């Protein structure tokens, strides 16, 4: 429940204190933080579930099993993942004194100090990784889970602030990231302007196979066969009769309530059995780091080749220096080596 730049310190402190965790995505704001969180969880024997609850969404589990695992898409060579919601902050509020109830120095914490203004923290790269860190991780993690994928071999990206240049937000309003798995490309795109190509899928994933296409989101899925066969549509499964409190729970997104319940139950079962949950911290580390590497690739303007064993970009010291954000004193960046 904290901004992204606090996740690593909070998570590691909690694990050091003996706690198992539910940790929101992205698990960190830089790559080395992800590596340190994973190392700490393994060394300390903690169960850590990440808030990538598509892994627990009933209709997405069905889509994975029915169409991908059964081979009905054939050879999948391209997956498009996307978010076309106009979610980038558009305002330009003045810098003001922080509210009296807010300790602004503590809020900023290890991030670079900046003046307070009334705008969402996700609008600022000092505290986040923008829309890529917020939304691409959901879609990339879903695709990796549905297809059983680990790390990509290469990551490239381009984008920037192309349309809304007046806002104080310093996150991209347009960006494409390609995650290259040799014979498979996963391509992310976001635009915080214009219309989505498919209004029914403004946020989701489209799997292209040589035998069919699958569109999937938290609201539905659609399977479109190539040639013979009938298309299949499935909407999200609500559980309002079984859980009538969903109708009145404040701020609850009803369409994700079934997934949240299953995700929490999965975590509790993993804690009881001391096993790995469906969205284990290692999966969260991979999905988080990949998205951060996408932003680094865009910043440097070149493709990054990743070595997962070393947690390093191959042959690119400039990129490797960007895997770790400098911490503002007195906070100290967590070190993976401490938990080796």
Show where each model-derived region lies.
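Conserved phosphate-coordination/catalytic loops
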Residues: 1, 5, 28-31, 134-137, ...
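Short, hinge-like loop/turn segments at secondary-structure boundaries
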Residues: 40-43, 66-69, 96-98
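Beta-strand-loop-alpha-helix segment that lines the small-molecule cofactor/substrate pocket
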Residues: 3-4, 8-56, 71
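Contiguous beta-strand/loop segments that form the cofactor/metal-binding neighborhood of enzyme cores
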Residues: 61-62, 72-75, 80, 84-282, ...
């Amino acid at each position: 429940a904290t901004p992204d730049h606090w996740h690593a310190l909070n998570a590691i402190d909690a694990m050091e204190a003996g706690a198992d965790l539910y940790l929101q995505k992205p698990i960190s704001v830089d790559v080395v933080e992800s590596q340190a969180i994973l190392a700490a969880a393994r060394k300390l024997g903690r169960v850590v579930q990440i808030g990538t609850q598509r892994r627990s969404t009933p209709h997405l589990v069905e889509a994975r099993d029915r169409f991908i695992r059964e081979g009905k898409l054939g050879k999948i060579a391209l997956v498009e993942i996307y978010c076309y919601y106009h979610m980038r902050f558009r305002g330009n509020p003045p810098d003001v004194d922080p509210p009296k109830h807010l300790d602004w120095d503590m809020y900023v914490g290890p991030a670079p100090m900046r003046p307070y203004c009334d705008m969402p923290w996700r609008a600022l790269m000092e505290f986040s990784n923008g829309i890529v860190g917020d939304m691409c991780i959901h879609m990339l993690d879903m695709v990796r889970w549905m297809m059983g994928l680990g790390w990509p071999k290469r990551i490239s990206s381009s984008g920037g602030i192309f349309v809304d240049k007046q806002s104080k937000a310093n996150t991209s309003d347009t960006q494409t990231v390609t995650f290259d798995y040799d014979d498979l490309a996963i391509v992310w795109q976001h635009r915080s302007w214009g219309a989505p190509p498919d209004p029914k899928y403004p946020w989701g994933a489209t799997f292209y196979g040589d035998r069919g296409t699958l569109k999937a989101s938290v609201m539905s899925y659609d399977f479109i066969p190539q040639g013979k066969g009938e298309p299949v549509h499935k909407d999200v499964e609500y559980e309002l009769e079984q859980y009538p409190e969903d109708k009145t729970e404040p701020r609850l997104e009803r369409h994700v309530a079934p997934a949240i319940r299953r995700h929490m139950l999965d975590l509790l079962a993993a804690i009881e059995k001391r096993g790995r949950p469906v969205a284990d911290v290692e999966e969260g580390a991979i999905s988080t780091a990949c998205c951060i590497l996408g932003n680094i690739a865009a910043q440097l303007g070149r493709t990054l080749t990743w070595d997962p064993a070393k947690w390093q970009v191959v042959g690119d010291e400039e990129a490797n220096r960007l895997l770790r954000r400098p911490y503002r004193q007195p906070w100290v960046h967590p070190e993976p080596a401490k938990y080796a």
